[in-house]
Amino acid sequence: MKPTAQILTDILAEVRPLIGQGKVADYIPALAKVPNTKLGIAVYTNEGEVIKAGDAEESFSIQSISKALSLTLAMCLYKQEEIWCRVGKEPSGQAFNSMIQLEMEQGIPRNPFINAGAIVVADLLQSRLSAPRQRLLEFARQLSGDTHIVYDKVVAASEMMHGDRNAAIAYLMRSFGNFENEVIPVLQNYFHACALKMSCVDLAKTFSYLANKGTSVQTGKPVVSPTQTKQLNALLATCGLYDGAGEFAYRVGMPGKSGVGGGIIAVVPGEMTIAVWSPELDASGNSLAGTKALELLAERIGRSIF
């Protein structure tokens, strides 16, 4: 079965009672102000059709979903061995901002989707781009077809002000020799990436290349190679949902990436990209209602990579 607007609307109605059972991210004050009742879903097919329901066109802070975009950009700029000598490809099994593992493993983060790994990717981008912040914004605008995408400067400033742990992670990696640039500018770029404001429709369009062997459905142009697409989807399937990646694979069965803003993207290779948004999070930092919505959608349309 193919997704329809009615199926999406029905799914949102089914998951709405879950609102109130999760917790909006409050350690970033600007995120704590987002109404917990927001709920949206969008599907973008490889034929270029948008199917949506709920608050699918309202922009929100994508947070760690940006890590998939940053890694894609780094893969366009570096040979693979230059990236993977500095960050691993394994699930961490730890909280996304844990430092214990990083210390034990000599400053090499487990994967590019936990904070330490994403900060290494931000460092890589800083080394190759004269204006990494502008380049990432242009990348998001180009892939989504939405020229109105911006950074939420209030969120970025809020994260920088409350970002001591991320700064500690960066300095710890630098002490092990796994850092090339000044820490503060890299952190500023990292926090801005997390503060990208996009809607479910924007996100589904942006990541369409992951469902289409590396070619953006929105632009018709190659973003990465088919091999790199396979690699990205493998990392998303194993590491994309913090320490809830196994649970997500079990329930949803798609490569995905979440953010503490309540967004999740999911990929059905060869067919479609999906984005959901509900700000309340579960214990792993993933959208509670959003995960359930994706689980129901996977069941209804009979899709899974497994």
Swiss-Prot record:
Reactions catalysed: L-glutamine + H2O = L-glutamate + NH4(+)
Residues holding substrate: S64, N115, E159, N166, Y190, Y242, V260
Pfam families: Glutaminase
Molecular function GO labels: glutaminase activity
Enzyme class: hydrolase
GO biological process: glutamate biosynthetic process; glutamine catabolic process
Classification via InterPro entries: Beta-lactam/transpept-like, Glutaminase
SUPFAM superfamilies linked: beta-lactamase/transpeptidase-like
Disulfide cysteine pairs (residue numbers): none
EC number(s) from the headed UniProt entry: 3.5.1.2
Keywords: Hydrolase
Assembly behavior: Homotetramer.
Family: Belongs to the glutaminase family.
Protein name, UniProt field: Glutaminase
Organism name: Vibrio campbellii (strain ATCC BAA-1116)
Lineage start: Bacteria, Pseudomonadati, Pseudomonadota, Gammaproteobacteria, Vibrionales
